[in-house]
């Protein structure tokens, strides 16, 4: 019977992705799984790569995608943005509505139509249960991890059979994975980018919070696949911001990126200069963002109303949505005003009649409501500086990223912590997408002389004796990296072992994130301690983990499938990809149907107008034919298919052409009203025209026929 408590660790090998794993020496000491090797037997390096000059890196490590546009996407909790390299500079791409950012909102109407972006956000109050926002807070997570977040939204967050998060959509009787909703936002961004660039976009660099764990990164990549995108690279948001800030800057600087978005908080310390962007450390909190500040205002408003009226507005989905939107608006206004008026008429009704909310929120009261959230911003900043082995005096610039950094109390806190005014030369809503575009340009070969060295945000390890986490790859290890551990059996004839892979910084398994467990079967029966199974952990440049195992005795490589992770299984992703393609096809067909119908309506109107204007000038047989085809087109518009409308439209156009021809074939057609080619208007005849006083002024009627 295999158990994680019955595995021998025979030694540890640590190596970069450039080197082969060192062989295990014959005299390596055997110890029980769960014991730490001393420093002589555990040669972990702090980073996969030592500090190298940019010249060293410029020779390799670059994935090239030739002659194809690669975009950078900031997939945000509240808003998303897309950018591309244009004319050698990163440029924000405006969406179909002409906006530089797109709300990360997806909605389904009662008739099954899907809305994405601003149009979805506008109807949230009247359709709260089918409007999905802040979905990024649920991506790649188990239901047990999002208890607090699930109470902040107006839609139902449910648990599936594996304990993963699903979002219920009663309008179409379906539940979605968070990846599917995010994929629909990505799809809109890419479609809008394709139109803007006049080139089909299929490849992208997508950003994630620096403190996202492996499951969340994998889920984000899956969202890209479902959207029909090839995600070439997942990069951290603070790192992307530094790329945008440091692009084309030559001087060396140590910068701290303070990234407070709608749902997450990250802090990264980087060395930037001469094209090299090296992340020294990163820290953060994936349960802290602008949504939490909004929630404090919502709770305050709902609490006061319950005290005065005895009604809990948080149980009313529509009222909750109105409160949430009002709280966000009030928060934004308090960034420039000392107080704001909150007015919510007809928020609910009782037997006594309709009830309203009319109150004033001051900036001081807002800061009081959010005081503990502001305190939570301190620790990641301090941790990041400590891990980078730097003091506040070593920081040259502080870059603010994310819309929530506009809150005056946040800016004041940063100033107190670092001792200098933040740099305000970058747009906090756009800088991440711009940085992603720079990285996209590097991968596409449009940008050279840039080297990016990122780090793993969280430690990676295994469950060992007593429910303890033994760290294999420590946090802030430069990526990509690869480390291995050699295991053996703890019992004679043992043929399998089971290992739980963990990510986090706490000492005990229960306090860390389980990425899943794998069972290694097929070990040849042998006395205990004889088999040597090397388990290798690889973290790629995206920060995504893969695990492999090799039986060192036979050289046989075992395929390991991690189970129980909070990401979607492969077959589920494939199903969602095909479903998204089907939806995309249906959307195109719906759009074509609408465009065809609109065109047909316009032709009907123009034809009827033309018949009315021409009146008796149209020969009766021709008029009858046109009217017959007009009737057929009207019938097709009322209940016909798109193809039927197209056929009827073509037939009507043919008859209208005949109508025009018949007008010109009539005697005296030159004087008839009708479509006249530009420049062919004739002057007055000798008998009827009159010259003006100067002999060059003509009395005539001018008809502009279009």
UniProtKB/Swiss-Prot annotation:
Main location: plastid
SUPFAM superfamilies: Actin-like ATPase domain, Heat shock protein 70kD (HSP70), C-terminal subdomain, Heat shock protein 70kD (HSP70), peptide-binding domain
InterPro entries cross-referenced by the UniProt entry: ATPase_NBD, Chaperone_DnaK, Heat_shock_70_CS, HSP70_C_sf, HSP70_peptide-bd_sf, Hsp_70_fam
GO CC field: chloroplast stroma
Subcellular location(s) of the protein: Plastid, Chloroplast stroma
Region of interest (Disordered), residue spans: 663-706
Keywords: ATP-binding, Chloroplast, Nucleotide-binding, Plastid, Stress response, Transit peptide
Matching CDD domains: ASKHA_NBD_HSP70_DnaK-like (cd10234)
Recorded family membership: Belongs to the heat shock protein 70 family.
PANTHER family per the UniProt record, alphabetical: HEAT SHOCK PROTEIN 70KDA (PTHR19375)
Protein name per the record: Stromal 70 kDa heat shock-related protein, chloroplastic
Organism, as annotated: Pisum sativum
